[in-house]
């Protein structure tokens, strides 16, 4: 049991660090560590992320034997590694993404028109009001950068989700669980995963979720989850997915959203990148136990040698 406690302690430390991971190297290291944690729990893991979904391009694990598939966020350059990526990205262009793109286009069009008017004014005046033109140009470039950043973020989330779906389909396996990091995935992608793999459980680790809380979402039998949560988290608020919550979370039926951090006890400074949160260690330890029991209940009692399995 000492080895299992050490593994849980490592997973606890990892979960505390994940919210502060910013650089690609740090995120990649976090993915490797998370893979080791699941391997220590006895699961065969496939890590999908920065190198695509085929063979040696995988960050870790063999997809033909994986029981847990971990998906991390992609960007536009990495999305090109996905087979039929354009078709997948076109399918993922739901109404929400279309509305976002339309809003960005309208903003850019208005700013371009304002810039043209200011240019005409500056050209007709002898003294000129070039500071207005410079200001408009700066706002235009800022809006353009934000639009490109938003489009890349949407495409990255969609690409990661559909790469996960494509990987599971290609190898014709029945994964025990899907694990998502950060904001990976879209409502449409989760719906397709649920339709194609209804037997799989969902573990959703969200560092900056609704109200900036650290959340874990589990999919399983509602009665069993309610009983387990009533025993392990008597003081926590367990919210049904029927509530008006984030669309990504609501899209997975029969799930439970567990907030392991009280929003009133945490601090978050945005958009400076500084993120500090006070985490209840006992709650995260209990969350690890519940995740282990739901994904592989038989190993909950007789998991005696995690070091050799890792």
Specify the residue positions occupied by each region the protein language model found.
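Active-site metal-coordination/substrate-binding segment of hydrolases
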Residues: 71-163
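Structural motif
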Residues: 66-69, 201-203
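Generic beta-sheet signal
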Residues: 67-70, 176, 256
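Acidic/histidine-rich catalytic neighborhood of metal-dependent amide-processing enzymes
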Residues: 119-122, 130-232, 240-248
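A non-catalytic alpha/beta surface segment that caps or lines the substrate-entry region
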Residues: 19-65, 82-121, 307-309
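N-terminal capping segment at the start of a domain
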Residues: 1-29, 35, 146-150, 260, ...
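Active-site-adjacent substrate-binding region
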Residues: 35, 201-202, 208-310
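Short acidic, S/G/P-rich loop/turn micro-motifs used as interaction or catalytic elements
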Residues: 75-79, 184-187, 209-211, 262-265
């Amino acid at each position: 049991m000492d080895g299992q406690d050490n593994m849980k302690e490592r997973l606890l430390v990892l979960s505390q660090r994940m919210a502060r991971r910013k650089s690609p190297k740090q995120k990649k290291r976090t993915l490797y560590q998370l893979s080791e944690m699941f391997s220590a729990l006895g699961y065969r893991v496939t890590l999908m992320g920065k190198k695509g979904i085929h063979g040696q391009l995988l960050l870790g694990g063999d997809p033909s034997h994986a029981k847990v598939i971990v998906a991390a966020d992609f960007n536009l350059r990495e999305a090109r590694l996905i087979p039929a990526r354009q078709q997948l990205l076109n399918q993922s262009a739901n109404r929400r993404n279309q509305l976002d793109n339309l809003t960005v286009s309208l903003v850019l069009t208005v700013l371009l028109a304002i810039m043209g008017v200011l240019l005409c004014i500056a050209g007709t005046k002898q003294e000129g009001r070039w500071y207005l033109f410079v200001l408009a140009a700066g706002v235009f470039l800022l809006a353009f950068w934000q639009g490109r950043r938003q489009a890349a973020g949407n495409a990255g989330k969609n690409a990661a989700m559909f790469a996960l779906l494509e990987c599971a389909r290609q190898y014709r396996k029945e994964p025990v669980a899907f694990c998502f990091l950060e904001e990976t995935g879209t409502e449409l992608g989760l719906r397709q995963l649920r339709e194609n793999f209804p037997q799989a459980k969902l573990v959703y680790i969200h560092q900056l979720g609704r109200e900036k809380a650290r959340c874990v979402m589990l999919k399983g039998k509602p009665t069993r989850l309610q009983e387990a949560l009533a025993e392990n988290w008597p003081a926590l608020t367990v919210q049904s997915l029927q509530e008006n919550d984030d669309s990504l979370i609501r899209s997975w039926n029969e799930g439970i959203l567990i907030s392991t951090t009280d929003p009133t006890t945490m601090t978050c400074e945005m958009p400076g990148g500084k993120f500090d949160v006070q985490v209840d260690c006992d709650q995260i330890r209990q969350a690890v136990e519940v995740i282990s029991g739901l994904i592989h209940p038989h190993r909950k009692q007789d998991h005696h040698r995690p070091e050799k399995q890792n």
